[in-house]
């Protein structure tokens, strides 16, 4: 109950801060950064993954729904899914403050988290997301992505993501300060005016520290290399 009150308080604070802004044209959009199949030499480990946003609002305040997850294609099972409801308000020319709530699926303990963070463009046009997830088992996440234009139609997008649990969570097989690192590179072809872009690439992930020990104790690998094929969509 206390956690819910805190989350609602954060959202209310952001809305109140924007209440004095004059009416502006409404903007909206959908951007799916990743909609892909990830392949390994073992079909049991192949997954379908997605990561996308939908937003509506103005330049001064945006409401964003973010979804990402993985689905085991071989076993026909949802492995993880994360849904965030976020409010974003500019704090500088290139960065927004973020406040919201995150829901994890499948159901389990501590599946609701408050979200505090920043989102924007760093120098040299690196897209940055830095979020703190507040709950009984808090964690932090840092993401960086860069779009390198090779030709008018070909774009190489390297990315890196670091998840750091701040407390043990045996249900999720993560240990405090045992981070998970994900690194990828995707080469896309602009098929329809940046709205549809098929891509291929590689994706590597690895866990460290006590999280690695937990995985190995369950007979699981601590890392994985995937070849990926998918679509980027923007409307």
Question: Can you say where each PLM-predicted feature lies in the sequence?
Answer:
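Residues that define the transmembrane beta-barrel architecture of outer-membrane proteins
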Residues: 46-50, 79-83, 110-114, 136-140, ...
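Outer-membrane beta-barrel initiation region
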Residues: 21-74, 89, 227
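Extracellular loop and loop/strand-boundary signature of outer-membrane beta-barrel proteins
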Residues: 70-72, 103, 129-130, 168-173, ...
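Outer-membrane beta-barrel channels and translocator barrels
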Residues: 59-61, 88-94, 121-125, 149-153, ...
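Outer-membrane beta-barrel "beta-signal"
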Residues: 185-191, 222-235
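Outer-membrane beta-barrel proteins
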Residues: 74-78, 108-111, 139-141, 155, ...
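A contiguous pocket-lining binding segment that forms or flanks enzyme active sites
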Residues: 126-175
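Transmembrane beta-strand segments that form the barrel wall of outer-membrane beta-barrel proteins
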Residues: 30-38, 61-72, 95-105, 118-135, ...
């Amino acid at each position: 109950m206390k956690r819910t009150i805190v989350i609602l308080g954060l959202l209310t604070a952001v809305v109140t801060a924007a209440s004095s802004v004059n009416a502006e044209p409404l903007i909206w959009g959908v951007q799916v950064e990743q909609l892909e199949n990830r392949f390994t030499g073992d079909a049991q480990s192949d997954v379908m993954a997605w990561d996308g946003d939908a937003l509506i609002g103005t330049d001064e305040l945006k409401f964003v729904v973010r979804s990402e997850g993985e689905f085991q294609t071989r076993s026909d099972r949802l492995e993880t899914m994360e849904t965030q409801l976020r409010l974003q308000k500019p704090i500088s020319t290139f960065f927004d403050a973020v406040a919201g709530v995150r829901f994890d699926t499948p159901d389990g303990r501590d599946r609701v988290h408050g979200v505090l963070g920043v989102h924007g463009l760093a120098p040299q046009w690196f897209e940055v997301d830095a979020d703190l997830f507040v709950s009984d088992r808090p964690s932090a996440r840092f993401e960086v992505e860069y779009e390198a234009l090779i030709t008018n139609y070909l774009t190489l997008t390297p990315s890196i993501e670091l998840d750091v649990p701040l407390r043990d969570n045996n249900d999720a097989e993560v240990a405090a300060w045992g981070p998970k690192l994900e690194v990828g590179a995707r080469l896309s072809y602009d098929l329809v005016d940046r709205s549809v872009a098929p891509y291929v690439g590689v994706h590597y992930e690895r866990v460290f520290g006590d999280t690695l020990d937990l995985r190995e104790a369950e007979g699981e690998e601590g890392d994985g290399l995937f070849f990926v094929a998918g679509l980027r969509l923007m409307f």
